[in-house]
Amino acid sequence: LTISEVQDLYKKYINPNQTKIFSSLPFGKEIFDSAEGVFMHTLSGKKILDFTGGLGVLGLGHNHPDILKARINFQREKNLEVHKIVFSRYMAALSSSISFLLPANLNKSFFLNSGAEAVEAGIKVCYKSFNSKKKFILYSDKSYHGKLIGSGSISGSYKKDQQFPQMENC
């Protein structure tokens, strides 16, 4: 696909506003096709330093060799990916290891798919911990915590654009 075709598809099927913003920036005129370490590479041959770290998911960089090696070995052995509907020895072992690092009363793990889900779970833990007696949640208003109702309610930058109801007292 050309950059124009990609932009058209983004506009039609993903987010017209995001398309407008990205298209106005220099990187919005490029197609990125590969990445390694802290650099992303475009089809036109440019090497761009990625300051975002994948918005928090690429702390070790793009395609880190140790992670790639582990992934390749995992796939070569035809291991079952982490699956929440059946027993997973990986989740069992990881949760056991995590429990040794935390205080004794924090001995359960709850595996989630995203940061927004983690924030939502944190809100629920607060609610349960105080038996619904607390009426407010302390949060940073210059923040982004996710796009779900709860996480969006405590995201300062997202609240003004959100077209959904907010949690009370946020």
Residue ranges and their predicted role:
Residues 36, 51-53, 140:
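A secondary-structure boundary/capping signal
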Residues 29-49:
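Active-site and channel-lining beta-strand-loop segments
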